Amino acid sequence: LPHARPSDKEFENGDFVVMDFGALYNGYHADMTRTVVIGEASSRHEEIYNIVLESQLAGIDEAKAGITGAHLDQVCRKVIKDAGYGEQFIHSTGHGIGLEVHTYPRISAFNKLPLLKNYVITIEPGIYIAGWGGVRIEDDCLIKDNKCLPLNKSPKEMLVLK
């Protein structure tokens, strides 16, 4: 599932842990997600993680003023679908962020309106495999005329916590 439910489960070797962080500064919100592996990473962990990272980087490369939220969603979703995990990308690609954590515009197949210069959005593709685990990588991005600027500075390589 994209968002965990509290439980008494203890982390086990090979668990993915999705960590969604938020911040509030002078009335403006920030949002960031990173995923780590507990213990040892398998080739499957690396495969899933790298697909999600490739999807997010494709979205960051494509995002700019004038494209629609639907187009940006499709760019990220295509990477995951082409890798064979389209059915496991079960949420929208992102959302606007600012005075609220989740605000307009939605980065989803349903938003046919163009992104405007100086919007701040999240780009957060993910893969979630029932009974196994999931990965999401999320950054806040400032939309400019011909590009977007990621605002988060946290590394994106897969971290393994031993």
Where in the sequence are the language-model features?
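Active-site neighborhoods and metal-handling regions in enzymes and metal-associated proteins
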Residues: 1-162
